[in-house]
Structure formats: structure tokens, C-alpha cells
Curated annotation (Swiss-Prot):
It is found in: Cytoplasm. Its EC number is 4.2.1.1, 4.2.1.69. It catalyses: hydrogencarbonate + H(+) = CO2 + H2O; urea = cyanamide + H2O. This is Carbonic anhydrase 1. It comes from the Eukaryota. Zn(2+) binds at residues 95, 97, 120.
Length: 261
């Protein structure tokens, strides 16, 4: 996945992705607008169960359009089970999406309402596949927890992550990031909506069972500004900040959104 051929500006942004990635116009694309009146309560949905080992946090990487906090996923130490999932899924990384102002930046919307940002915790099906790279293109390959972020009080649980950004300011930089429990970033209620969708940026594989938390988490305007301080340019190049990195909602095309609550 060459990140040079896509991005979030007018020349290479979401409207252009279908030229290189025709699946961008597929039937199961993400994100979506969640219409709460049309989400169907499904009593068969189980509670979501996460068990994360802080020792599996490994490093933080500037990938150009965002940054990833990467986990050791060589064994089942940090896993997601339950919810809509038949298998156990292993945490591989989390990342964020944001916008150039505080009134938008999330990828998923709820009844048309935009949030200030969105956290994605990415897991792969370790019961069926041997690596994230193998699972990424399989229909049951990935499960992503999406947490909407709303501007408000500062979030102390986010601060360790945000403070590490200075060590990976430019594209391609990586730095150790250890002993972190990502469950500290989850809301207190794990009520959720779920639907079948895709990665929200190229290669846009339709391989994701989405678990979108009903409850949002907060972060302050200053914390949002820290996200926007990340650079998509490499060291020695003119500085290009990542001001915005979210895809707009895609058509539902007949899919069902289920609610656990």
C-alpha cells in the first residue's frame, strides 16, 4: 500500500480513491451514518469482551496520513471476543482520525451528527488466520472498535499517547511505546452498534466487522491540536501538518445496522 498515491486533499483524497481502488464504490464501504431509528436491537448480540495486556504495546509509528500505536500480536495476549464475533480477534494497532476544526473529524456519524474525532482499535481473526497481513482481505478477517471523540474536558488517558507524538513528528519515524493499556481509552459503557464494512482508507478491503461504541469519549481542544501537529512530510522536507484524515460516510446499500442495546 503505497501511501504516496492517496491522501486526504483534493488531488488524492476520498473522492479520487476509486480510480486506484475501485472497491471504493463497493457495497460494503465504511464509514457510514448510523441512523439510530433504523438500527435494529438484536438480543442475540453478546457483550463485547476486551482483554488487553499493557506489555504488548510496542511502538508508535508515523505512517504519513496518521500515526499507529502498534502492538505485539504474535500471541493471544490482547484480544477482543464476544459481541457480534464468532472468533477471537487479536489487537494489532490503534489509530485516530480527526478534522481541521473541532466540529468534525469523526468518520462515523450518528443521525448525521459529526464528532471531533474517532479512535479505531484494529483486531484480526487469529482463530482462522496466521497474521494481520493475511486476514486484512478476508471477509471475517478484521474487527475494529470505533470510539467517537467529542471535544470537551481533557482526557488524561489520551495524554501518554499525545505526548509521544513529538518523538514521531515526521513521516516514517518510529519510537518505542510500551506499557499501555488501550482499554483505558474505551468509554465506560460498551453498548454498541455493529455492521459489516470496510477499511476506511486504501486498500479499502471489505473485511471489517465494525463495533461502534454508543458512548463517546472526550478530549480537549488542546489535545485535538496536538493531533493536528503531526506531519505527513518527512524530516528535511517542508512541513505539512496532518490537519484532516477522515473519509466521509458511504452509502449503506441495504446493509443492516444492529444495536446491542
Amino acid at each position: 500500500m503505497a501511501s504516496a498515491d492517496w491522501g486526504y486533499d483534493s488531488k488524492n483524497g476520498p473522492d479520487q480513491w476509486s480510480k486506484l481502488y475501485p472497491i471504493a464504490n463497493g457495497n460494503n464501504q465504511s464509514p457510514i451514518d448510523i441512523k439510530t431509528s433504523e438500527a435494529k436491537h438484536d438480543s442475540s448480540l453478546k457483550p463485547v469482551s476486551v482483554s488487553y495486556n499493557p506489555a504488548t504495546a510496542k511502538e508508535i509509528v508515523n505512517v504519513g496520513h496518521s500515526f499507529h500505536v502498534v502492538f505485539d500480536d504474535s500471541s493471544n495476549q490482547s484480544v477482543l471476543k464476544g459481541g457480534p464475533l464468532a472468533d477471537s480477534y487479536r489487537l494489532t494497532q490503534f489509530h485516530f482520525h480527526w478534522g481541521n476544526s473541532n466540529d468534525h473529524g469523526s468518520e462515523h456519524t450518528v443521525d448525521g451528527a459529526k464528532y471531533s474525532g474517532e479512535l479505531h482499535l484494529v483486531h484480526w481473526n487469529s482463530a482462522k488466520y496466521s497474521s494481520a497481513a493475511e486476514a486484512i482481505s478476508k471477509a471475517d478477517g478484521l474487527a475494529i472498535i470505533g470510539v467517537l471523540m467529542k471535544v470537551g474536558p481533557a482526557n488524561p488517558n489520551l495524554q501518554k499517547v499525545l505526548d509521544a507524538l513529538s518523538s514521531v513528528k515526521t513521516k516514517g519515524k518510529r519510537a518505542p511505546f510500551t506499557n499501555f493499556d488501550p482499554s483505558s481509552l474505551l468509554p465506560s459503557s460498551l453498548d454498541y452498534w455493529t455492521y459489516f464494512g470496510s477499511l476506511t482508507h486504501p486498500p479499502l478491503h471489505e473485511s471489517v466487522t465494525w463495533v461502534i461504541c454508543k458512548e463517546s469519549i472526550s478530549l480537549s481542544p488542546e489535545q485535538l491540536a496536538q493531533l493536528r501537529g503531526l506531519l505527513s512530510s518527512a524530516e528535511g522536507e517542508p512541513a505539512v501538518p496532518v490537519l484532516s484524515n477522515h473519509r466521509p460516510p458511504q452509502p449503506l446499500k441495504g446493509r443492516t445496522v444492529r444495536a446491542s442495546f
